[in-house]
Amino acid sequence: MRDDKTKKSKLSWSKKMVRKWFNIKSKTEKFQADVSLPQGVEVEHRNSFSEREPCTIKKSKTEKLNKNWEQQARQRKMNYENPRIIDVQNHSIFVATWNVAGRSPPEDLNLDEWLHSSAPADIYVLGFQEIVPLNAGNVLGAEDNGPAKKWHSLIRKTLNNLPGASSACHTPSPIPVPIAEIDADFSGSSRQKNETFFNRRSFQTPSVWSMEENDPSISQPRLDRRFSVCDRVFFSHRPSDFDPSFRCGHRPSDYSRRPSDYSRPSDYYSRPSNYSRPSDVSRWGSSDDDNGPGDSPSTFLNSPGSFLGSAANENGYRTPWNSSQYCLVASKQMVGIFLTIWVKSELREHVKNMKVSCVGRGLMGYLGNKGSISISMLLHQTSFCFVCTHLTSGQKEGDELRRNSDVMEILKKTRFPRVQSSADEKSPENILQHDRVIWLGDLNYRIALSYRSAKALVEMQNWRALLENDQLRIEQKRGHVFKGWNEGKIYFPPTYKYSNNSDRYAGGDLHPKEKRRTPAWCDRILWHGEGLHQLSYVRGESRFSDHRPVYGIFSAEVESNHKRSKRTNSHSTARVEAEELLPYARGYTELTFF
């Protein structure tokens, strides 16, 4: 009996290793999520396959056809009796990527400056690379999920720790105003105005509540975060086109109107003229009409009373942090790649059809030290796909082609099982079938310059010259990769490679023992699909890793259906009765009136 158990366990272990080595997928990918109990208590980390398990019972084609026909007929009848209204809402999404260089987080690691860097979002999508060292034991052996649990604990604690609970003021980072055009002369206008990009294109943590940019007598505060803005900068697609009544203290999800009610996409974020908001809340940003095409986004500072943690104002509006508890809807690890998604608790019931797909692109082209984790979900009636990747490394000429190949293989091999659900729910089976797609991660694209040349341009803060030699931009313009995808404008220094616990790039002349790597924007966020508007593109300044975290804030249009209730008031009844009395022959076109 004992021999049978030992033999069975050995077979089970060997089966797992073979599956891992050759990237053999199970019928459904497991992931972890919170379980909501009736009393409201959440239990972390349940293993799940999908929100609704794909049907595994084999049925005859006749049975399936009959069932589909019955469902369609029932759905048509329901739609006829209870017509639906499509309501478009805007939800904010915080997306971040961070290569943590194989370091496990300490318990006291402070994530506040990262996750609380802006007004609270409705959805947090956090992607990590190298949460474990990429050694042979972790790549070929059993998966080490210890660091993932630590990250879960830190993220949960940070998201659910409401700033301002101790009567302290929380000042959110504003959304910058995108005013630079794609072909703007980044360096020229700055020299004309005698300003540096580091000061102009950065959000500065305020030590005073207002300052004049050109006043040398006022000391400049320490730079904590550096912002960039959307690359799709053209009329009516900029946050600067927002209505002036748009306020910082209110999330994009507070606005809900139909597309037909607006003349341009940017008007989704504005309210009617007769709508009033609390007057004591600071704005997200200001208009860019006073700036030229080569100017950098202006720095906007909020007053200390503009954002109180959990207080309500006289009009009864509570700040966004009020009751903002977040729950984990999906979490997946593949060796060092780790993707976790958190949503506000009130949105949890509207998140459906959770599915996961992993593609290994590491050793032998199959193992998971490189590759992707993709999570598919349905929010109301809009499908989302979040892809977290760690692509092939290397700064030799031609390595970018291997990264291009990784992207194409991920798009080709990522497959989601079809969910057996109601006829009106979407169930995309690949990445590009989704309505909204966000791709994040350590893409490892380098700058095609020598170390000394790139370092000199970084010190000059000449981002344009650096971006002209950025491999991702070059390959994208040539149509070799990410064709039709978008990325925000970059106004921050390269995020890789830094010396340990330092703001200095590795490999300088004074440190010959360090590995010399040309500074590069390895960590990127791209998106695909209509209805996604990037509001900011940000670099963090944590020294925890040799990479700097990168994160962006998106406003996503989400469609939801509402059944139209039948009204039987006197006016509608009278109108129907009058129409029924009218004589008619074959159709409405042949009506004869008295």
UniProtKB/Swiss-Prot annotation:
Catalytic activity entry: a 1,2-diacyl-sn-glycero-3-phospho-(1D-myo-inositol-4,5-bisphosphate) + H2O = a 1,2-diacyl-sn-glycero-3-phospho-(1D-myo-inositol 4-phosphate) + phosphate; a 1,2-diacyl-sn-glycero-3-phospho-(1D-myo-inositol-3,4,5-trisphosphate) + H2O = a 1,2-diacyl-sn-glycero-3-phospho-(1D-myo-inositol-3,4-bisphosphate) + phosphate
Tissue spec: Broadly expressed in emerging organs. Mostly localized in procambium of growing organs. Restricted to vascular differentiating cells of young organs.
Principal subcellular localisation of the protein: nucleus
Deletion phenotype: No visible phenotype. Increased salt sensitivity with reduced production of reactive oxygen species (ROS).
Biased composition (Basic and acidic residues): 251-261
Stretches the record annotates as Catalytic 1: 435-450
GO MF term list: inositol-polyphosphate 5-phosphatase activity; phosphatidylinositol-3,4,5-trisphosphate 5-phosphatase activity; phosphatidylinositol-4,5-bisphosphate 5-phosphatase activity
Similarity comment: Belongs to the inositol polyphosphate 5-phosphatase family.
Protein name from the UniProt record: Type IV inositol polyphosphate 5-phosphatase 7
Organism: Arabidopsis thaliana (Mouse-ear cress)
